[in-house]
Amino acid sequence: MKLPRKRTTTIILAAVGLLLCSLASLAMLLVGADRQDQRYAPLLTAAAAAPIDAATEARIRGFCGDCHAVPRPASFHRDMWHNEVEKGYQHYARSGRTDLDPPPMGLTVAYFRSLAPEHLTYPEPAVAATEFRVSFRTEPLQYEDTVRTPPAIAGLCWARLRADDSPVLLASDMRSGHVISLDLREPRRSARRLAQLSNPCHIEPCDLDGDGTIDLLVADLGSFKAVDHSRGRVVWLRHEAPTGEFKEVVLASGLGRVADARPIDMDSRGRLDVIVAEFGWHRTGRILMLRNTAGPGQQPRFEPEELDPRTGTVHVPVYDLDSDGRPDFLALVSNEHECVEAFLNQGHGRFHRQTLWRAPDLTFGSNGIQLVDLNGDGKIDILYTNGDAFDNDYLSPWHGIQWLENLGSLHFEYHRLTDMPGACVALAGDFDGDGDLDIVAVSFLPRGLKPETVDVKSLPSIVLLEQVARGQFVRHTLERGFPCHAALVVGDFDHDGNLDFAIGNNTMGAEAQALGQTWAAVWWNRGRTSRP
């Protein structure tokens, strides 16, 4: 890109100033990374004052787009780019790589600042012309332990604990460490503590030992805050049939932050293995297979095997994607990768990795997927949210909900469904009983949200997308001002034929203090109104 002379001069002056401001901190970082190595010296020179010509721009884009998509300048307002570029250079310094040609940091900052807007603008999605034909009644839920410890619900699940009993609401509280169940048929709504873990996240019901009772597979983060450590675990809550109690059995420990764990009979032996999304943070994280090595009639015994070394995997749902009779799994990988990938089971313990879709920007904020046939064509699609703002507390204009439509032969077509700041979980269900799937979604944003000009109380926190024709949706906003819902589950909780949903509250979220000790709320579907 050829720049006019006046603009080039402006960029040169900005680059020099920004570089001088960052020399000290960056020098300490780079010297700490390798005190004896001078290969980073060009980053610390005044060469940043060179004009940004086409060759320099190519150098910047080559460096900033080597392991992920080149960041979009419009992802942040102008004054944010110094911090964002510095983080990228820090990441490169820590990586130990020497194969790239990093431009002087001040020049890179100046390049992105020159293209970034002074202030961000946020989209205003169109809403439905008429109200949703279904009304809801909300019921806040409280749990006695939240009086002492504010709730931080990370996962909700609607499942049976006994094959011959009705489903119950299961929840994981990543602050208190509790895994709890709540029978919504009980008038008192008293919760039962099933286990005390460290920082539980995803809960997956399964019969891991094949004894006919329903166990719980739990991903335990190992910390409340996002840091690198080795305290993450995969925990099997083994259901003791005679007593109804759950015994904690650790399947894997010494891991980074574990976000998800799913059972998979990888080679159709009749014994369940486990796929693990070890999200980690910056230096920890990967995708693991816990291979069940137990013999017939023995209790499960697992050996870990790394399938992918990247950090940032959020979800690993299991599905036979290529219809060959062998279970595959999908992985939503965030951090700088921002992609959905299929791990196709080749048999004999081998998987072939294939990218199904990749976001155009490393700040996309991927945070959840659901596998569901959204348009009713018989093929499993991917419902996908991107609204993670907890890495920098910054509200992105790109947050929202999308649908990756399965066209067959492992080809998926991208459809943007709606914009939604902090979109965290989206689940499909037929809420209006018309035979097709609608979508309910919740948002989760941090306290101290930036930029400060954002009016948090005006932001949508629960949205419903009504499917009005195959693959076509209109938007209804059910709630505003409480973007602290980190969990969501859908089910017919009262067995009246109408689909309800429940939300989980996390006090890390914005405006959570206004909800007090309410750890969850049920939105009871009261059925269709008279509108045709």
Description of each model-found segment:
Residues M1-K2, S530:
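Accessible peptide chain termini
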Residues K2-L20:
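N-terminal Sec-pathway targeting helices
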Residues C21-S25, H337:
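Alpha-helical transmembrane segments
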Residues S25-G32:
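Juxtamembrane cytosolic interface motif at the C-terminal end of transmembrane helices
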Residues A33, D37, P42-P532:
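Beta-propeller-forming repeat regions
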